[in-house]
Amino acid sequence: MNSYQKGKEKGDMLEVNFYDTVDDDLLKFAVIISQSNGKWVMCKHKERDTYEVPGGHREEGEDILETAKRELQEETGAVKFDIEQLCVYSVTGKNSINENGEETFGLLCFAEIREFSGELHCEMEKVVLMDELPENWTYPLIQPKLIEKYLQIQKQSYSQIQQTAKQTIAYIKKIIKPGMKLFDIRKLCEEKLLELGADSFWYWDVGAFVFAGDETTVSVSGKQYVTSDKIIENNDIITIDLSPQVGNIWGDYARTIIVENGEVVDDIELIQNQEWKSGLQMEEKLHAELFRFVTKETTFEELYYHMNEFIVENGFVNLDFMGNLGHSIVKVKGDRIYIEKGNKAKLGEVNYFTFEPHIAFPDSKYGYKKENIYYFDETGLVEL
């Protein structure tokens, strides 16, 4: 038995622990933390006024993952879903499903549900999709701790894949030189992303969008993107936008890189071309303004209007082909919501979102982009 960042919850003599693995025959339960379209999927029992995460007992001879799938289908009516194993949990102490109080083990899973049948074949009365977790839990000393573990694992996963993108940009900065083809830069970036842990690329299977010179003002969907035959010049401007993923966990990271006299200039203050320098300084200013302006209550639309006004006030234009400035990070590409007009959702209602202003001076042939992923914790806005 291997310890997995052991965490405990005590109260009424209950203790919750987490492990990476245990012997398979010890696993008697499966619990499936579930979401659908960004909402928590909670079950209400016919005989209770409380809510619970779907889950249940393993049947004789049943594979534990099949237990998870079966319980999910029976208790939520899920018919189309993606499910993944997270870790093993255990509960020690007497409770409604463990009369002797000995340590019992279960598999903790996560499921993204895409379609429900509308029928429940179990003791559940109904399924409720919630923006916020319930206050009236059926198992208040157990399931909130399982949710907390899921969120911790999720954050680690997103941080790791985003770090892969950051390391790839740092790597490519060291080897970019005049004479390199954009296609070769794309190939090197994508190979590095895979080497560092990505298993695929979430945006139309393109891992690295690479633009140079007057192409840096181009804003195009990945569906139409084709890497040009441009070659890096002795003095050049290059924008690289990365979209790695592992499983269905996304990274999203972009930077505009300046080459002067054949060398990458990493310090904005040392850039000699004043237009390029001003463009990158404005990107820094925009991200600083993001921290100043937003709260969890800020809507995507409010951020859209504020930042577009801020861009214009500072003498720039927004180049994005859709006019937006970023999007939520989700597990299904079609579920993204955008920093755009009409989006009344609050930033605090999504787990993560990108901020990626693509800007230029009016009528200039050069564009600039800086993209990070952000989220809120108890202290406020944080860069992932």
Predicted regions and their residues:
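Active-site neighborhoods and metal-handling regions in enzymes and metal-associated proteins
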Residues: 153-384
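Acidic, metal-coordinating catalytic segment for phosphate/diphosphate chemistry
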Residues: 1-31
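Conserved Nudix-box catalytic region and its N-terminal flanking loop in Nudix hydrolases
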Residues: 35-74
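Short helix-loop capping/hinge motifs at secondary-structure junctions, enriched
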Residues: 40, 115-120, 264-265
